[in-house]
Amino acid sequence: MTKKVAVILSGCGVYDGAEIHESVIALLRLDQRGAKVQCFAPNIAQHHVIDHTTGDEMPESRNVLVESARIARGEIKDVRELKAEDFDALIVPGGFGAAKNLSDFALSGASCTVQPDVLAAARGFAEAHKPVGLICISPALAAKIYGAGVSCTIGNDAGTAAALTEMGAQHVECEVSEIVQDEKRKLVTTPAYMLAQSISEAAAGINKLVDRVLELTH
């Protein structure tokens, strides 16, 4: 039976949106495994816009949903429409958009909040005990979704791991090619570009994450 998987994007571009490589690798693996995918994003303004050639902030405003549609080839919906009962699993790629648009973790660290529509959607999967995959920096959302005690990884960055621990998560160090699973909560995480030095290194862990998330839907 074909599995239906929701993917929440956070814009388009590593410095101010969804990490494009991570997003495409996840979407490709889902397609290779025969899953039916629907992309979602919050219909809100980005925190800011970054020139990806220089790293400088640009004097303009962009919409997270509109930018995410670039990755989704236009096939995208407002995350307000995302209901866990319509899907078997959820995956959230990383990129600074997860920490600037889906949440304010990049600014507020352990005292961050998650965008309300994103939080409601993700908690729906947690409450339904359906599998969730969080990639790269998006495990920063884990404690807000699941509460204290959730196990997850962002690789081995001490500062970020400390912030996750302060939020109530149990951080587990992880190689770029591996995954960490919280079996009780059906949460799977992988470091991807928190550690990856190439797209193939990122793909190694993301492919394992997608495969495991799909296994957990059975």
Feature map (PLM): residue ranges:
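A short, charged/proline- and glycine-enriched loop
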Residues: 1-3
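Active-site-adjacent pocket-lining segments in enzyme domains
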Residues: 6-38, 75-218
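N-terminal beta-loop-helix "entrance" segment that forms/cooperates
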Residues: 40-65
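Glycine/small-residue-rich loop that forms an oxyanion/phosphate-binding "nest" at active or ligand-binding sites
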Residues: 59-75, 80-85
